[in-house]
Amino acid sequence: MADLEAVLADVSYLMAMEKSKTAPAARASKKVVLPEPSIRSVMQRYLAERNEITFDKIFNQKIGFLLFKDFCLNEIGEAVPQVKFYEEIKEYEKLDNEEDRLRRSRQMYDAYIMRELLSSTHQFSKQAVEHVQSHLSKKQVTATLFQPYIEEICESLRGDIFQKFMESDKFTRFCQWKNVELNIHLSMNDFSVHRIIGRGGFGEVYGCRKADTGKMYAMKCLDKKRVKMKQGETLALNERIMLSLVSTGDCPFIVCMTYAFHTPDKLCFILDLMNGGDMHYHLSQHGVFSEKEMRFYASEIILGLEHMHTCFVVYRDLKPANILLDEYGHVRISDLGLACDFSKKKPHASVGTHGYMAPEVLQKGTCYDSSADWFSLGCMLFKLLRGHSPFRQHKTKDKHEIDRMTLTVNVQLPDAFSPELRSLLEGLLQRDVSQRLGCGGGGARELKEHIFFKGIDWQHVYLRKYPPPLIPPRGEVNAADAFDIGSFDEEDTKGIKLLDCDQDLYKNFPLVISERWQQEVVETIYDAVNADTDKIEARRKAKNKQLGQEEDYAMGKDCIMHGYMLKLGNPFLTQWQRRYFYLFPNRLEWRGEGESRQSLLTMEQIMSVEETQIKDRKCILLRIKGGKQFVLQCESDPEFAQWLKELTCTFNEAQRLLRRAPKFLNKPRAAILEFSKPPLCHRNSSGL
């Protein structure tokens, strides 16, 4: 029966994988719904205060670029060929051979440079033109051939064109998408969890599918009780920090994180899914690798380490078991549990796996940085070639002996190794950090320029164009079955209680990596959601002519901000009423949908603006003269933060002005008021 369950779990997992490749959006069981266009008023202020509304910030975001491009191609009343030219340059940079680059560069020169030169409409500098002409005439077509144009294209777009974009519906749509992104609160309900694919010291790893996009991920779940039992809280939090550091920027050679969230019992990392097994497994199945095969893996791992070191992260646990293969055979570095940020302070702890740890890591109290990873790389490459660590002769398991050899023994390399390989390994396995390859100030560049990698096109490596020496079997789960992986003994943690102070440790644990979320959305549901939203907004406008006119009411007035909020209402104070609010320097106005009559509350009548909670939801509490209260709730985190800030600032400024104003200005004004009794007290029929 257990065998049948394992087979069914494998089949379900493989089917989910296949469907996620062909039509991930079709597999989505939840729907992403964009907020109404009126969200723009709040989101524009929210983003502007965080310096997120600049040309560079929007243009360099995936969704921002697509909306800006759509605006330039379809909505602006003038031709904007620069955007297409920019896209062509980006595609050109991905080309991996000189012949293709030469052909494409000539086509681009004819289409975007020569044609404009002939018609005297070329907007770019003479230096940029001459740079391209000079290199083309010599057939020097590097990936950076058009780089001067990238800078000038961006400069030409950031002025009037960007300002027009900011005034367009496409910027409104950008605000709608950003509101969704900044209001993500993940739970287990947002994923379909499939079979277990691995287990570690604190928890398990599962294959999973994100419900709203259909994209497949790996979900690493750490048991909070087990973490507490092993006093691993610092390690768990450190892994989340390290993953957040290395998961920004495009690095295809690290298992990156897209999300982190937690439940009452688990800490969850949502990571790149790697289906090809690990190098330790393949070493046992395939046997040792040749120099040529090892060179392939070394080159990809070097780029992964280079990315980490650029982020000032030292990995500290490089070994075959932590190198995972994807379904095509390319590799990524996984498990950053022992990684460390050395940007401000160098680590000195002795952590890692015996047989791969650098001498300076083993010497207690000695500080180190990225140097440790280059030594570990030498140990790992030796194992791929010989089947064992250079300091683990005759399969000894004595950790002290392994450490002693690491600190004292000069590795004897086999005669069968080529001179180039011997030079590489001797450089990496230097005990003296100052003499070690990669530690002379050049970092990964020192390895890239080593004779062992002569002839390697590193752009080719980055684009994963070299054929992998080993391709994992298709249609198989390259992981042990659930029975072999095993499970934790629940008795171990039976006596462990999670207290409020334990949960407080993880209050800042949730995280969304913006660029990775946007990439996921664009690959899956972006076009479909935009199309659905366009239809919904068109239907709403046709049904209610007042919709879309909220901003018209605010224009020409001193309105600070406007948008929807929920107001606690009805005689029994149990119902949230959705109203459209306008904040002015001296008052707060609102009206219901379809209502022409405005209600208002003056700043003179407010005694304080406070944050409160009702049923675990953050709310804004306005205390009103006479002992009454006015309670508001927002539909997203950014809205709540901005409304609370703007109401507080407006109230404080109004109070300051009222204290300075002559007494006759403080006479009560007639106003249409709506109040509610304190919602946390005994309720009665008085109030709204």
UniProtKB/Swiss-Prot annotation:
Self-association state and partner proteins as the record states: Interacts with GIT1.
Protein name as catalogued: G protein-coupled receptor kinase 3
GO biological process per UniProt: receptor internalization; signal transduction
Role this protein plays: Specifically phosphorylates the agonist-occupied form of the beta-adrenergic and closely related receptors.
SUPFAM superfamilies recorded: PH domain-like, Protein kinase-like (PK-like), Regulator of G-protein signaling, RGS
GO cellular component: cell projection; postsynapse; presynapse
PROSITE patterns reported in the protein's UniProt record: AGC_KINASE_CTER (PS51285), PH_DOMAIN (PS50003), PROTEIN_KINASE_ATP (PS00107), PROTEIN_KINASE_DOM (PS50011), PROTEIN_KINASE_ST (PS00108), RGS (PS50132)
Domain Protein kinase: 191-453
Residue ranges annotated for the RGS domain, each copy included: 54-175
Gene3D superfamilies: 1.10.287.1270, Phosphorylase Kinase, domain 1, Pleckstrin-homology domain (PH domain)/Phosphotyrosine-binding domain (PTB), Transferase(Phosphotransferase) domain 1
Enzyme type, top EC level: transferase
Domain PH intervals: 558-652
Region (N-terminal): 1-190
UniProt binding sites for ATP: I197, G198, R199, G200, G201, F202, G203, E204, V205, K220
InterPro entries noted in UniProt: AGC-kinase_C, GPCR_kinase, Kinase-like_dom_sf, PH-like_dom_sf, PH_domain, Prot_kinase_dom, Protein_kinase_ATP_BS, RGS
